[in-house]
Structure formats: structure tokens, C-alpha cells
Amino acid sequence: MQKFILLLCLITVTQYSFAQKDALIKFEKERKNYSKKSMLVLGGWSAANMIVSGFATNTRNREMRYFHQMNVMWGGINLAIAGLGYWGAEKEKIDNPTLADVLKHQNRIEKTYLINAGLDVVYVGAGLLMNKTSENQKNPDKFKGYGNSIMLQGGFLLIYDAIIYTIHRNHGKQLKGVEKVTVSSGPGSLSLIYTF
């Protein structure tokens, strides 16, 4: 009877171990998909900036010309970031994740978007400062146009980063409590660990 109970426990724990692995793979695929889609959004914004502002730089209004020039520059940088981000998410291997790997990835992506949001606030502030001090500069139109563009780009990125952070944060809530239970198996071994 004891052997039967031990065998039943072994089968149950093994099933849980495989179910946990499948759940981790599913979670990682979803996180990767969110990352790729967010890079497509950033890439779309960047391309739109480059196209629209590329045409709009042909204006007689000097302030608006500088505004659009800066939009094109930001668009190029953001397009490169979006391309590299998409490529990085695409090549990421998620076929055999451990719980520690999943938690590390989730923590890293949430921190990244929080740090980015902080930088976005700095961009908006820098653009505002350029705008407000433009009259004291040798080329006030350039400072004002660049400042307005930096405020626009920083404002968009702040909203973008806040939304993407919220998406990843809500997705990460699926892991709440999971880190307390760890099941693993290997050749000749089986372990179930519950952390209080």
C-alpha cells in the first residue's frame, strides 16, 4: 500500500512538473509577443514621424522646420530601437524556461519600462526648458522648434512606456504565488519545494 501511495504521489508531482513547464513556456511566449507588438507600435510611430515630418520640413516657418527636423531625427533613433527590440524579442529562446528565468525576464522588462518612463519625463522637461529659454538664444526658432519636438516625442514615449509597462505588469500578475512552489525532476530525482 505504501508503494502504491508513493507511486501515486510521484505521478501527481511529475504531472505538476510538466504542467508547470508548459505554463512557463506559454507565459514566456505571451511576454515575447507583447514585446514584439510593442516594438511594432514604436516602429510605426517612428516611421510616421520620419515620413510626415520629412515632407513638412519644406516650410518657410523656421520654428516649424526645426520642429520637423528634430522629429525626423527622433524617428530615426526610435526606428532603430524598435528594430533592434523586435529582433531581440524574435531571437529570444523560450523553449525550456525555468521559473527563475521567467521571473528574471519579467522583472527586467518591468524595470526597463519604468526607467524609460523616467527618461521620458526628463525629455519633456528638457524640451520645455529649451522652449522657455529660446528667446535668450542666438537662434530662438531652432531652440523653440527643437524644444517643442522633444516635448512631443517625450510625451508620446511617456504614454507609450506607461501603457506597455501596464500590459507587462498585468501579465506578470499570473506569476504571483508561483514562485513559492518549485517542482523539478531529473534522472533518478524528483523534488517539490514550497517556500513559506
Where are these regions (language model features)?
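Canonical alpha-helical transmembrane segments of integral membrane proteins
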Residues: 43-53, 119-128
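Aromatic- and histidine-enriched alpha-helix N-cap/loop-to-helix transition segments
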Residues: 42-46, 71, 150
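Loop-to-helix transition at the N-terminal end of transmembrane alpha-helices
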Residues: 62-78
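Canonical alpha-helical transmembrane segments
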Residues: 52-56, 77-91
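Long, highly hydrophobic alpha-helical transmembrane signal-anchor segments
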Residues: 45-67
